[in-house]
């Protein structure tokens, strides 16, 4: 089983939201949203040559995957803007469902993370936008 197959298998068989596999890497998370990617990014971790599997990938997560150096991603659901990010930066992508945009959890509008980065063309500005949005959501504003 290669890293990609292992990541997809682990995601589908476990209770995980995000799995990254590679040489000496077996990263799993049950956290929702972009936190499973933002935390290792902020800790300076990089996953060059690794494969990832994720339940839902919007543009914010796609930017984080690019910054983390992931080589290939499987997504249960992926947004068109996220797919475009992966294509632009040469990250392999497989998915079950392609959607226009990622909705928020209550299905009343756009996901706040997707909205936070929708106008960005480069991944470098994404972490700051994501952290600002998380702080705003946490404060209830």
What are these language model-derived features?
Residues 1-76, 98, 103-113:
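Conserved mixed alpha/beta catalytic, RNA-binding, or beta-rich assembly cores of soluble enzyme
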Residues 77-81:
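Short, polar loop motifs at secondary-structure junctions
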Residues 68-71, 83-141:
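C-terminal binding/interaction regions
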């Amino acid at each position: 089983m290669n890293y990609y197959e292992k990541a997809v298998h682990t995601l589908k068989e476990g209770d995980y939201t995000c799995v990254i596999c590679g040489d000496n890497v077996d990263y799993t998370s049950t956290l929702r949203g972009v936190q499973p990617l933002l935390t290792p990014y902020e800790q300076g971790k990089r996953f060059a040559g690794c494969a990832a599997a994720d339940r839902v990938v919007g543009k914010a997560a796609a930017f984080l995957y690019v910054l983390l150096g992931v080589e290939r991603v499987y997504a249960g659901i992926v947004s068109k803007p996220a797919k475009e990010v992966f294509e632009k930066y040469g990250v392999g992508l497989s998915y079950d469902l392609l959607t226009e945009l990622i909705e928020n959890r209550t299905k009343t509008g756009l996901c706040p993370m997707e909205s936070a980065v929708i106008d960005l063309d480069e991944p470098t500005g994404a972490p700051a936008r994501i952290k600002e949005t998380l702080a705003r959501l946490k404060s209830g504003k």
